[in-house]
């Protein structure tokens, strides 16, 4: 009898300790944001999250408000779906939310949390951010690689020309746009072209496939990041998979560094990073350099291609908008030469189309997760230290309180309007926003403008283009875009000059 009493007492103490660890008294007394109610043991509210995270959280926000909380395993998560709350997070509380949660993916793909995207806020992150702003994404650096972008866009046009023939021909856009983005980034980074005529690299195909796998495994969708027990048993072999991906990516990146050391051309980003390594070898190790290259390839390969694919899908479903954009290009650029980057500031309607694509189909529907480094308040609610912040940009871009008819494609809504960053955030907001937004907008603008200028476009059949989205950190189309295109006279002229 006495031993049973001791056993029950022991179990009660253990359960109380676990309860206090998961749900501290100080937390329960706070004015936390609304929540879906009693969380299930161990998993919390994870059962409420569907395959498309942004849609699951949007549905919950309609019930619990634009600021609500979830208990995902043993982690408290703040979900923000309004411009006002996002602005408060990234202005008043910008430093508090400058940290990143230490998810499993960051350990392997992010070189043990040392990359600019995944590293904790601090001196190391500031060094990387400064390097990106001054050495990689400054106006001077981008202008230095202008010829690469224009050449790759021309190569895309020639590839489509060969695929379509003289009349309307069927083309699949996803792979071609991905190859363009990959080539642009790789030529800037390593001076190598991997896809296109007379170039076909199995190694690059493998690496691009690995990038796709990274985006599939990224975000806040891995249960093991929230439930330690699932990480201990390696739920669905997640950790084993990302470890294997990281090893293969690391080998590819190390080969790029090795080749640059041998060639010493001094014209690529790797060349520049290796010169920094010579002066500061203790800081710019191969691991740090590989992490920088990794971020450039991940950020530069998928997002621009996805955005152009969404934009073309929207235009094919709205041919009158496509025609209006073509008329603007012919008026501002003419019909005797290809569109150039220097033309983009004059093409306001094209810019409006891109902004509307960013709004309706953001490449990153959920911003990269943040984590609070201290207690703070958001919209009057208490947010404890260590809370994960998820900002639903997809929902903010469809907020009916700010956007008129938010589900409709209306580029005109952006005409002459200077939007606050909290209303349209395709590249994030605050000090950890994407530093490569300038490059992305140049690539997207030039590519989309050239496709409109050089081809007639039609849907395959009468049915509208399927606009369903797929899953992942970026938001791909569930069905890759296929369309009919026919070369216009301007492209015939370009082809004759090239041959």
Curated annotation (Swiss-Prot):
Coarse class of the protein's main subcellular location: membrane
EC number(s) recorded for this UniProt protein: 1.14.-.-
Ranges that cross the membrane: 5-25
Tissue specificity annotation: Expressed in leaf epidermis and in the leaf internal phloem-associated parenchyma (IPAP) inside the mesophyll.
Keywords: Glycoprotein, Heme, Iron, Membrane, Metal-binding, Monooxygenase, Oxidoreductase, Transmembrane, Transmembrane helix
GO molecular function: heme binding; iron ion binding; monooxygenase activity; oxidoreductase activity, acting on paired donors, with incorporation or reduction of molecular oxygen
Any Gene Ontology CC annotation: membrane
SUPFAM superfamilies: Cytochrome P450
Glycosylated residue positions: 112, 183, 266
Entry's localization field: Membrane
Binding site for heme: 434
PROSITE patterns linked to this entry: CYTOCHROME_P450
Membrane topology: Single-pass membrane protein
Family: Belongs to the cytochrome P450 family.
Name of protein: Cytochrome P450 81Q32
Organism the protein comes from: Catharanthus roseus
């Amino acid at each position: 009898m006495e031993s049973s009493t001791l056993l029950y007492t022991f179990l009660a103490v253990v359960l109380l300790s676990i309860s206090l660890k998961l749900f501290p008294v100080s937390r329960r007394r706070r004015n936390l944001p609304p929540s879906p109610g009693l969380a299930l043991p161990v998993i919390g509210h994870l059962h409420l999250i569907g395959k498309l995270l942004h849609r699951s959280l949007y549905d919950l926000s309609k019930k619990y408000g634009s600021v609500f909380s979830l208990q995902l395993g043993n982690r408290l998560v703040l979900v923000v779906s309004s411009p006002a709350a996002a602005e408060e997070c990234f202005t008043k509380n910008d430093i508090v939310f400058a940290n990143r949660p230490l998810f499993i993916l960051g350990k392997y793909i992010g070189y043990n949390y040392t990359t600019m995207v995944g590293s904790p806020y601090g001196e190391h992150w500031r060094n990387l951010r400064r390097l990106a702003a001054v050495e990689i994404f400054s106006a001077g650096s981008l202008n230095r690689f202008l010829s690469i972008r224009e050449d790759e866009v021309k190569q895309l046009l020639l590839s489509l020309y060969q695929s379509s023939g003289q009349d309307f021909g069927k083309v699949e856009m996803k792979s071609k746009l991905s190859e363009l983005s990959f080539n642009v980034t790789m030529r800037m980074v390593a001076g190598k072209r991997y896809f296109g005529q007379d170039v076909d690299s199995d190694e690059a195909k493998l690496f691009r496939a690995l990038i796709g796998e990274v985006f599939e495994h990224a975000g806040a969708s891995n249960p093991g990041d929230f439930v330690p027990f699932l990480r201990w048993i390696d739920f669905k072999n997640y950790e084993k998979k990302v470890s294997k991906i990281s090893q293969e990516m690391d080998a590819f990146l190390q080969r790029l560094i090795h080749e640059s050391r041998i060639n010493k051309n001094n014209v690529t980003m790797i060349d520049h990073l290796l010169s920094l390594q010579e002066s500061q070898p203790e800081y710019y190790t191969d691991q740090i350099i590989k992490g920088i290259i990794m971020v450039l390839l991940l950020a530069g390969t998928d997002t621009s291609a996805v955005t152009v694919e969404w934009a073309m899908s929207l235009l094919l479903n709205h041919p009158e908008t496509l025609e209006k954009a073509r008329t603007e290009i012919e008026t501002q650029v003419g019909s005797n030469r290809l569109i150039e980057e220097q033309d983009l500031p004059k093409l306001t309607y094209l810019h409006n189309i891109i902004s509307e694509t960013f709004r309706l189909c953001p490449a990153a529907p959920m911003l990269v997760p943040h984590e609070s480094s201290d207690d703070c308040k958001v919209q009057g609610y208490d947010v404890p230290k260590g809370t994960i912040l998820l900002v639903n940009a997809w929902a903010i871009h469809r907020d009916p309180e700010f956007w008129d008819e938010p589900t409709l494609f209306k580029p005109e809504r952006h005409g002459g309007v200077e939007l606050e960053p909290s209303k349209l955030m395709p590249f994030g907001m605050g000090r950890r926003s994407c530093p490569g937004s300038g490059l992305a907008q140049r690539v997207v603008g030039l590519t989309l403008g050239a496709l409109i200028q050089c081809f007639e476009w039609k849907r395959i059949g009468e049915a509208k283009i399927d606009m369903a989205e797929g899953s992942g950190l970026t938001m791909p189309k569930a069905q890759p875009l296929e369309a009919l295109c026919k070369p216009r006279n301007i492209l015939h002229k370009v082809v004759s000059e090239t041959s």
